[in-house]
A protein has these predicted regions:
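Metallo-beta-lactamase
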Residues: 36-159, 163-174, 194-262, 283-290, 339-359, 363-366
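Catalytic core of the metallo-beta-lactamase
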Residues: 120-123, 221-282, 297, 301-305
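Divalent metal-coordination and catalytic microenvironments
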Residues: 122, 132, 170, 227, ...
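Active-site metal-binding loops of divalent metal-dependent hydrolases
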Residues: 133-135, 171, 232-233, 264-266, ...
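Acidic/histidine-rich helix-loop elements
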Residues: 135-152, 235-243, 293-299, 327
Length: 376
């Protein structure tokens, strides 16, 4: 090990590690294993759901899934392990957006705007939707600690247009942001969430009559847009005592004659092929591609697995998400993009790795640019 890569065990170093990762990542690592979680206080029950067992939700059977490391090993690694090139030195490029930019988008088409990480603004036949919006500085329960953004969003919460619908994949802090939801609470016409997440939103000020809560394979419709909650292989929880009390999901969005898939967070599992078979393929697939590690192989896909899942889904365009905004793992900040770009080129897959703030029009040809190359 070189001196540059050798862990430093000073109080200042440990405090820095805690501020960067401690609060949210300790909760996440504990949630990976049942041993960290109390089984008491099962207030909400969803016995009608095939996914609900005992006092929580579970994944579909997957005999090929690899086990995760213990919570202690994960936590120890975040505290004293070596992290190299996980945070960019150079600024991440951002294309700032204005209301005029959004208004100029063809109201008859479907558009996807990259806000960062897994957050996206959609313009579906003239109406605006949000997916997993996170506008806060940190993906954490605290403003002073936890993973910090690499870049600003391309527009502010105050600049958002009227939002017709909002889709949530699960309740982790990098997908369900309290400050964002509290601001949007009365400004969104309809929320679509997995089972159990409704209660989270009500606690953030969202009106009860605006929330549609769905199990896997259940669907809903709002002003011409059809949505279906589909399976994912992940977990949920926001504290050390609420493991899997809410469901996690991927989503199918149908607008006009086009279908968009959003993976949410997921490990690789046979469900992707089932989703592809049931819906007959997708015009665009937003696929998780980041935060993977050999310590937690069941809950996040490697780039190779993301490509395989995309092929299982019968997608036309692979859109890479869940990267280049937060430092959530041990791979370099650019590794997800490097690997998926090379894999897609080798397998002749049409790839989309848009710059933050870039607009992708579904079904419209575009030239993909490796914008991250050359950045440190």
């Amino acid at each position: 090990m070189t001196d540059a890569a050798r862990p430093v065990f000073s109080p200042k170093h440990l405090l820095s590690r805690f501020r960067s990762y401690g609060t949210s990542l300790f909760a996440a690592s504990c949630a990976l294993v049942a041993g960290c979680v109390s089984s008491s206080g099962c207030e909400a029950r969803y016995d009608a759901s095939p996914q609900f067992k005992g006092c929580g939700f579970q994944n579909l059977p997957n005999p090929e899934v690899l086990p995760s490391a213990s919570a202690w090993r994960i936590w120890s690694r975040f505290i004293v392990g070596s992290k190299v090139d996980t945070v960019p030195v150079d600024p991440i490029p951002v294309q700032m957006l204005s209301t005029a930019d959004l208004d100029a988008l063809d109201p008859k088409a479907n558009h996807v705007v990259r806000l960062g990480h897994s957050s996206h603004l959609l313009k579906l036949q003239g109406k605006y939707w949000l997916i997993d919006p996170v506008f806060s500085e940190r993906a954490s329960p605290f403003s002073f600690a936890g993973p910090k953004r690499f870049h600003k969003p391309p527009l502010t919460l105050e600049q958002l247009p009227p939002i017709e619908g909002l889709i949530l994949s699960h309740d982790h802090y990098d997908h369900l942001d309290v400050a964002t939801i509290e601001y949007l609470a009365q400004r969104v016409q309809r929320y679509f969430v997995p089972l159990g997440v409704r209660a989270r939103l009500l606690g953030m000020g969202v009106p009860a009559d605006r929330v549609t809560e769905l199990d896997w394979w259940q669907g809903g419709e709002h002003n011409g847009v059809k949505l279906t909650a589909t399976p994912a292989q992940h977990f949920s929880g926001r504290t050390l005592t609420d493991r899997d009390r809410t469901l996690w999901a991927s989503w199918v969005v149908q607008s006009g004659d086009q279908r968009i898939f959003y993976s949410g967070d997921s490990g690789y599992f046979p469900g992707f092929k089932q989703i592809g078979e049931r819906f007959g393929g997708f015009d665009l697939a937003l696929m998780e591609n980041g935060a993977y590690d050999a310590y937690w192989p069941a809950v996040h896909m490697t780039p190779e697995q993301s490509v395989q899942a995309f092929e299982d889904l019968r997608g036309k365009v692979l859109y890479s998400v869940h990267n280049t905004t937060f430092d959530l793992a041990f791979h370099t900040w650019h590794d997800p993009l490097d690997r998926i770009a090379n894999l897609s080129q080798a397998r002749k897959i049409e790839l989309a790795t848009p710059v933050i703030g870039e607009v992708l029009t579904v079904g419209k040809a575009r030239t993909n640019v490796r914008w991250w190359e050359g950045l440190k």
